[in-house]
Amino acid sequence: MKRTLKMILALSLLGAPMARSQDNVPILSGALAFLGSSNGGANSYEPILAPVLVAPFGDHWLVESRAEVLGFIARENGTSGPYSGTFAATFDYLQLDYLANTHLTVTVGRFLTPFNIYNERMPVWITNLEDGPIIYTIGTRTSGSSNGFMVRGDLVAHPEWSVNYTAYFSAATTTENLQSGRAAGGRMGVFLPQTGLEVGASYQRFLQNGDYNAYGAYAIWEPPPIPLDVRAEFAHSPGGHGYWLEGAYHLASSRGTSTWLSRLQAVARVQQFIKGSNPQPGDFLPTVNVNQFDIGLNYYLPHELRLNGSYGRQYSSAGNANVWNFAITYRFLFPAWPGGHQ
């Protein structure tokens, strides 16, 4: 962990020498969060630091990195015994991008596995509910990150619609904090900007421990006049299949409204998982069928501070349980070295 923390510090200073001679300024952003959860009476707490570095150089090159320092504090026996904690540090991604044009970006290094939308687009400071979906590990094993290369861009771009694509290959890696599976896959989506609708599909071929396929579909709807966000995913693998559907609404008449009440956001999510006939080792999926609903409230305070609370009820043959969560999240953004400017 000490080695990883040193690498995180080094990355935060990476852009300083090159940016002094360029207009593009490396930016350090990310989030600091504290999460609490009670699942069936078992309480746990998670402090999280997730710094993100974006360092452009030249007209076509970009370095991107996100690290995560995560703590987990819980009772030793679940619902009894003294509290104990562990801390771990890892890199979610550390990648070099070559931006050829709007149709092609080439990435090498470690990157978030682009299966559906949750893994790439909903980090801790954006996700509306702190618990990830049950089907999250489908298409993202072994760590949610891939080590290899990726290409992405707009296949077709029109003012009224566009088609985006992503394709990648990942090598198997067992290095501490940099684990990944050997896999290949891709994603394609269609975006309609006037309606705020995007739909797409994902595919992955996992190439180790017995090759198998995973596939999925997603939808995002953000109608421009209304402060409503709707997101959904479906995913299937030999270990099971399922879906989640989530809606979030700011209590405002439009997206441009800014009042104390408009900072309040109501959230609801339903999800279902059906176990498969051929579970794979290390797929981290339930061994029984599961249904769950969650409701929550987010309040966005000034200065990038957010409060979150939610309640969920999980139903399965292994037993029903109440799931309570709360979180406080601070999002930061500033130049990567003292005296820098945007």
Regions found by a protein language model. Give the residues of each.
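Positively charged n-region of N-terminal signal peptides that target proteins for export
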Residues: 1-6
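Transmembrane beta-barrel architecture of outer-membrane proteins
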Residues: 47, 90-92, 171, 182-184, ...
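Outer-membrane beta-barrel "beta-signal"
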Residues: 151, 247, 320-342
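Oxyanion-binding "anion nests"
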Residues: 200, 204, 208-237
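C-terminal hydrophobic structural anchor segments
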Residues: 253-315
